[in-house]
Curated annotation (Swiss-Prot):
GO terms of biological process kind: methionyl-tRNA aminoacylation
The protein's name in its UniProt record: Methionine--tRNA ligase
Superkingdom: Bacteria
Function statement: Is required not only for elongation of protein synthesis but also for the initiation of all mRNA translation through initiator tRNA(fMet) aminoacylation.
Cofactor(s) this protein requires: Zn(2+)
Length: 726
């Protein structure tokens, strides 16, 4: 009997917006869960938000709200981001669910009854200013192991679990004062007492097969250093109350209650939850985590299960990943560095494209740097130039010259012998949770298809040997069906689109792989993806590069930069069309004072109708390098004001000047009377480095007004008086 797969992704803290690095675990677990279902394995994928503890309490203090309101806010944000990424949880719950308290307290009482809970008086930081004991994340200081600045629970730099009062140069995060040491009582889990059972369990697991190298190293090092009693209570209000006399005013430490959340969240949707969580014989527990969570899943959570002396389903496979970082910078919402889940949605780059790149570079054995230029290169060459190209060229060619009907043929033995070996390798990589290797194997299969199409030159043989050519193409069509199945764990929407080309006449199942089943007609075809343009990527790179990276060394003086390298002009909008491949993109034909005029493409359809803009005069960056958006050439960029609330308005010249003149330049007031330069073409990065702003309704650079060259009228932003110009 085949075992069931119980899959979890580390519960994300509900005190922030997830960035790309945070998404690695939920996406990895999603791909594995989809693979598991594809193989016909009974599968349950559980995740949810981790809502209790100091991280939530401290964030609520910062946002001046209650922990409950904060959790409601960020749970909704997380849920919407994961939905956009098309992550197929069986349940995405919360540790504030109705079963969590009783589940945590029940496990604690069993540990206490079995003699695995101890009491200790210890010394803890106490803030005299705020008159409270400071739980670990209420204290910042220097890690005693590596010297990195950290909070008091775990060092993000060296991953060591910390004892809070060992921090060097500690400070209270609320008032920034130096705390004192004061005695208090806490409860501990007696890890040394569980050590023998824990080590016996670890020895039974084939770590070399089921855990990655880093997880093995970190766990073995922790065991080698000797297990110590670990505190499980905290002096907080927001948490699961401790059901023990004299401890009623304390709550459980979040590391103790959070892993139990996997169980309580499961209870929300499955009455017979024990068939998953108390069924070690028939269930594989597969957990996806970041490297900073390894010890909580290999030592702490298993110790709780073992200490309860019940038949809990124990960890089998552990898929821990390294960090995904950003352009050699640290993800920081406040500093504006890195791209976060809500930012990704606004890029208008499809979710499957993001999924592809994250899996392609999944940090399985080493940290990985997200780089915009590499993102563009991989998408354009691998996803589009290889994978999408095969599907488009084969289906359109077959449909054009051989019609819609797909004949059932005997498959070419030599071709499929090679391909089936690749299928076996792909499935094995999935099974071992080597997701990056699985994806690259799929891309290799696609390359084989492209090479055969290119080498056999069906465009030359379609008339001379039509049947042979048709059979060649049919073999490739069955290969495309298989690719749509294999790629589905990584790019489910793309898989569905390919299946729709065939009327969804087959299921996402490994049973179809390498067969001549499931295909009857080609109902439709379309291009799956469009290339990422450099202008878009450059603008996104700049947007998320952080305040300190907005200018390069050559152009620190934004006034000189504008005068010497930027040309703004007034233009009249003559016509507006919508891009047939992208409804949100307007194609604007402009009168710029020249006989040929100008054309720009702009994503403003969400903000304006055609009728509001036709006939109006606007200002454009006239010397921007031409670029293509969804295949349409754009020869400039209109300018607009955006404020801190993301309100957006185009600069309309009629707001401050009657009878504007198409082609009139916009200059700095300080350049009046000077000979103006005709600057060379520039990138959008260069324009943004000028840092034009709206101040009290007037456009300025470093306090100097922008004006129309001939009329000397000041350029105004009437509807949004204060903001940045983009």
């Amino acid at each position: 009997m085949q075992k069931k797969n119980l899959i979890t992704a580390a519960l994300p803290y509900v005190n922030n917006i997830p960035h790309l690095g945070n998404l690695v675990q939920v996406l990895s677990a999603d791909a594995f869960a989809r693979y598991s279902r594809m193989m016909g394995i009974e599968t349950l994928y559980v995740c949810g938000t981790d809502e209790y503890g100091t991280a939530t309490e401290t964030k609520a203090l910062i946002e001046k709200t209650t922990p409950e309101e904060l959790c409601n806010k960020y749970h909704a944000i997380h849920k919407s981001i994961y939905e956009w990424f098309n992550i197929k949880f069986d349940i995405f719950g919360r540790t504030t669910n109705k079963y969590h308290k009783e589940t945590v307290q029940d496990l604690f009482l069993k540990l206490d009854k079995n003699g695995y809970i101890t009491e200790k008086e210890n010394e803890q930081f106490f803030c005299q200013q705020d008159q409270m004991f400071l739980a670990d994340r209420y204290v910042t200081g220097e890690c005693p192991n590596c010297g990195n600045n950290t909070k008091g629970d775990q060092c993000e730099n060296c991953s060591n679990l910390l004892v809070t009062n060992e921090l060097l140069n500690p400070r209270c995060i609320i008032c920034k004062n130096i705390p004192i040491i004061k005695k208090t009582k806490h409860l501990y889990i007696d890890l040394p007492k569980i050590k023998n059972e824990l080590e016996h369990w670890i020895q039974q697991i084939d770590q070399n097969t089921n855990w990655n190298i880093n997880a093995i190293k970190i766990t073995n090092a922790f065991l080698r250093d000797g297990l110590k009693e670990r505190t499980i209570t905290r002096d907080l209000k927001w948490g699961i109350p401790v059901p023990k006399k004299e401890y009623e005013n304390k709550v459980f430490y979040v590391w103790f209650d959070a892993p139990i959340g996997y169980i309580s969240i499961t209870k929300e949707i499955i009455k017979d939850w024990e068939s998953w969580w108390k069924n070690n014989e028939d269930t594989n527990l597969i957990q996806f985590i970041g490297k900073d969570n390894i010890l909580f899943h290999t030592i702490m959570f298993p110790s709780i299960e073992l200490g309860s002396q019940e038949n809990w389903t124990m960890l089998n496979k552990l898929a821990s990943s390294e960090y995904l970082n950003y352009e050699n910078l640290k993800f920081s919402k406040s500093a504006g560095t890195g791209i976060f889940g809500n930012d990704v949605i606004t890029t208008e780059i499809p979710s499957d494209v993001w999924r592809f790149y994250i899996y392609y570079n999944r940090p399985e054995k080493a940290d990985f740097q997200f780089m915009w230029d590499d993102f563009m290169e991989r998408i354009n060459s691998e996803l589009i130039g290889n994978f999408s190209n095969l599907i488009n060229r084969v289906l359109t060619f077959y449909k054009k010259f051989f019609g819609d009907k797909i004949d059932k043929i005997e498959l070419n033995e030599n071709f499929w012998q090679i391909v089936n070996i690749k299928y076996e390798r792909t499935i094995n990589f999935f099974k071992q949770i080597e997701l990056k290797a699985a994806l690259k194997e799929i891309l290799d299969i696609s390359r084989i298809g492209n090479k055969i199409f290119q080498d056999k030159e069906p465009w030359k043989t379609k008339n001379s040997t039509p049947q042979t050519t048709k059979e060649l193409l049919l073999n490739l069509i069955y290969l495309i069906r298989d690719l749509s199945i294999l790629i589905s764990p990584f790019m489910p929407h793309t898989s569905d689109r390919i299946r729709s080309f065939f009327g969804k006449s087959y299921e996402i199942s490994n049973k179809f792989l390498g067969t001549n089943l499931g295909l009857t007609t080609i109902q439709s075809t379309e291009v799956l993806f469009t290339k990422l343009e450099k202008q878009l990527i450059d603008s996104l790179k700049l947007k998320y590069s952080g305040r300190t990276n907005m200018q390069d060394e050559k152009n620190k003086n934004s006034i000189n930069l504008f005068s010497e390298q930027i040309c703004l002009k007034t233009v009249k909008i003559k016509t507006i069309d919508r891009n047939p491949d992208a409804e949100k993109l307007f194609i604007l034909k402009l009168d710029d004072g020249t006989p040929e005029g100008k054309q720009i493409v702009s994503s403003i359809a969400d903000h304006y109708t055609e009728e509001e803009l036709i006939g109006k005069h606007i200002i454009i960056v006239d010397n921007l390098k031409p670029a293509k958006f969804r295949g349409i050439r754009s020869e400039g960029m209109l300018i607009a004001t955006k404020d801190e609330n993301k309100n957006f308005k185009i600069i309309i010249v009629e707001d401050f000047k009657d009878n504007p003149i198409p082609g009139e330049r916009v200059i700095l007031e300080s350049d009046t009377g000077k000979e103006l330069k005709s600057p060379t073409k520039i990138s959008i990065d260069k324009f943004l480095q000028a840092q034009i702003v709206a101040e009290n309704g007037e456009l300025k650079i470093n306090g100097i007004n922008l004006i129309l060259e001939h009329s000397k009228e000041k350029v105004l932003s009437k509807e949004i008086p204060n903001g940045k110009i983009y």
